[in-house]
């Protein structure tokens, strides 16, 4: 296994690309070979994207009461969770959070809403455009948005008010998607990705591992992201939330998570691959290893409905690894 990992690493370092069969070979790594795989993924990350860790922060500006049935989500009306639905968050609170995250060291700030999506006619969308105009004036953060499905016209309007990157996750492989979502289709999500590209924004598109998919399906998913040529790939690790359909899913083992991160880097050598939610409960004391397994970005602060670590703890972890912020 060692020799094969090294050979495929050299192939990628020399500018080549691995195929799905070769990715499945890497997935056979176990025990110490996973650490070798992680180290080689770090070499690939160093060559293609360097040693700087991009830090993103998010804020839920409209929470809960979502009509979609995503099996993992605490905000769905199909589930019985402890989430309290809210209307649009006050503009001043959003500004205050942005300034606090900028002071803490974040590079990007993302406004997130619950629901299937928005059009340019929605009143909440018009409010969000106004908020982005203020953010562009009052902070130096790169601005991101995550508002669900999006028309091409709405995407253009976001770009015009300063949004540079749009997040819309595919969540998982096409072959597994219907096990997780039934109220909309994979192609609807892909259509939004295409609209974002047409508008000239970067695409942030990832998903969640640990929902019951196979490693083969994770690899299928990574190659879909490669084909779509997305810019940033947030990888969540399922944090099963009580009251959702996936509340009883077992956690992935830390080494399984690390192996998955590394394989994504082999498949997507020059992309921004980042930690998203779930690292605290799944990786525990091994969170640093993710950044040494090919990741070059992370969400800091709290998530949409779950708590993250203290920001300074994450910043110290990055410094301890010899990486740059």
Curated annotation (Swiss-Prot):
| Coiled-coil region(s) | none
User: Biological process GO terms, please?
Assistant: biotin biosynthetic process
What pathway does the UniProt record associate with this protein? Answer: Cofactor biosynthesis; biotin biosynthesis; biotin from 7,8-diaminononanoate: step 2/2
- So which domain of life are we looking at? Bacteria
Provide the binding site for [2Fe-2S] cluster.
144, 204, 274
Top-level EC class as recorded in UniProt: transferase
E.C. code: 2.8.1.6
Q: Where is the Radical SAM core domain?
A: 49-279
Q: According to its UniProt record, which reaction does this protein catalyse?
A: (4R,5S)-dethiobiotin + (sulfur carrier)-SH + 2 reduced [2Fe-2S]-[ferredoxin] + 2 S-adenosyl-L-methionine = (sulfur carrier)-H + biotin + 2 5'-deoxyadenosine + 2 L-methionine + 2 oxidized [2Fe-2S]-[ferredoxin]
MF (Gene Ontology): 2 iron, 2 sulfur cluster binding; 4 iron, 4 sulfur cluster binding; biotin synthase activity; iron ion binding
Matching entries from Gene3D superfamilies are given as:
Aldolase class I
Q: Which UniProt keywords apply?
A: 2Fe-2S, 4Fe-4S, Biotin biosynthesis, Iron, Iron-sulfur, Metal-binding, S-adenosyl-L-methionine, Transferase
Assembly: Homodimer.
Family according to the record:
Belongs to the radical SAM superfamily. Biotin synthase family.
Question: What PANTHER family does the record point to?
Answer: BIOTIN SYNTHASE (PTHR22976), BIOTIN SYNTHASE, MITOCHONDRIAL (PTHR22976:SF2)
Task: Quote the function comment for this protein.
Answer: Catalyzes the conversion of dethiobiotin (DTB) to biotin by the insertion of a sulfur atom into dethiobiotin via a radical-based mechanism.
Name of the protein in question: Biotin synthase
Q: Which organism's genome codes for this protein?
A: Carboxydothermus hydrogenoformans (strain ATCC BAA-161 / DSM 6008 / Z-2901)
